[in-house]
């Protein structure tokens, strides 16, 4: 009996580690597939006209209505060499595919709060390296938009004051769980605020 218990513990550990590895590989595969879809979605304005004139951008903006779970664009973070797909929605299935766009928040040129969320152990695992002044870029079918990080903040996971859905000024907000190395459901949230520069 004494030999069976250690073997059972080792087997259970291997099963848990194997499942964790499978989930990580599965999520990375979904993210890569969604990035391909997002690249196609973000190319549409250039392919349609060969240029980025304001009339074409307005037409593309008017038809820009991503459905839940659909790739809507790309988030580029030059400092950490990241190119991440943006998916409409923040449910668990959506976040497995990439960075989730909070459904009730806005998109660029809508003069409101743009909220993007991602997992700290997948798409946003290196966001802790970002600093004030670093750039974030959104590539959508109707244009490219650059934001500069103006501040970061750590809040309690139950703090609902971050997502205000204000409609007074355009701001980009990235949210992820914190601490980054925490195992399990993290008690805090890491928030990055960006202001539009182009």
Swiss-Prot record:
Q: What does this protein do?
A: Transpeptidase that anchors surface proteins to the cell wall. Recognizes and modifies its substrate by proteolytic cleavage of a C-terminal sorting signal. Following cleavage, a covalent intermediate is formed via a thioester bond between the sortase and its substrate, which is then transferred and covalently attached to the cell wall. This sortase recognizes a Leu-Pro-Asp-Thr-Ser/Ala (LPDTS/A) motif. It has two substrates, YhcR and YfkN.
The residues forming a coiled coil are none
What the record says about family reads: Belongs to the bacterial sortase family. Class D subfamily.
Q: What happens when the gene is disrupted?
A: Mutant releases elevated levels of the sortase substrate YfkN into the culture medium upon phosphate starvation. Inactivation of the gene abolishes the cell wall anchoring of a fusion protein composed of a beta-lactamase reporter and the C-terminal region of the sortase substrate YhcR.
> What's an example GO BP annotation here?
proteolysis
Give the top-level enzyme category: hydrolase
- GO terms under cellular component: plasma membrane
Task: Say where the protein is mainly found.
Answer: membrane
Localized where?
Cell membrane
Q: Which domain of life is it from?
A: Bacteria
Arranged from A to Z, the UniProt key words for this protein are: Cell membrane, Hydrolase, Membrane, Protease, Thiol protease, Transmembrane, Transmembrane helix
- Keyword Cell membrane included in the entry's annotation: yes
Q: What is the lineage of its organism?
A: Bacteria, Bacillati, Bacillota, Bacilli, Bacillales
Q: What is its EC number?
A: 3.4.22.-
Q: Does the record's keyword annotation contain Transmembrane?
A: yes
Protein's membrane topology: Single-pass type II membrane protein
Q: What induces it?
A: Preferentially expressed in the late stationary phase.
Q: What is this protein called?
A: Sortase D
Annotated site location: Transition state stabilizer: 189
Composition bias of kind Basic and acidic residues appears in 36-46
Membrane spanning residue stretches: 7-25
Q: Where is this region: Disordered?
A: 36-67
Q: Where is the active site?
A: 119 (proton donor/acceptor), 177 (acyl-thioester intermediate)
Bias kind Polar residues: ranges: 48-57
UniProt-listed SUPFAM superfamilies: Sortase
In alphabetical order, the GO MF annotations are: cysteine-type peptidase activity
| Source organism | Bacillus subtilis (strain 168)
């Amino acid at each position: 009996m004494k030999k069976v218990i250690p073997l059972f513990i080792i087997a259970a550990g291997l099963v848990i580690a194997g499942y964790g590895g499978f989930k990580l590989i599965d999520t990375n595969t979904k993210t890569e597939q969604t990035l391909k879809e997002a690249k196609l979605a973000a190319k549409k304005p250039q392919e349609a006209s060969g240029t980025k004139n304001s009339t074409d951008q307005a037409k593309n903006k008017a038809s820009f209505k991503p459905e839940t779970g659909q790739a809507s664009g790309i988030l580029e973070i030059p400092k950490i060499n990241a190119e991440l797909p943006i998916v409409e929605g923040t449910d668990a299935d959506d976040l497995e595919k990439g960075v989730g766009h909070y459904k009730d928040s806005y998109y660029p040129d809508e003069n409101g709060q743009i909220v993007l969320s991602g997992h700290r152990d997948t798409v946003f695992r290196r966001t802790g390296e970002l600093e004030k002044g670093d750039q974030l870029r959104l590539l959508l079918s109707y244009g490219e938009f650059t934001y500069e990080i103006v501040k970061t903040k750590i809040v309690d996971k139950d703090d609902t004051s971050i997502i205000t859905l204000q409609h007074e000024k355009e701001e980009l907000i990235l949210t992820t769980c914190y601490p980054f190395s925490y195992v399990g459901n993290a008690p805090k949230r890491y928030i990055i605020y960006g202001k539009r520069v182009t």
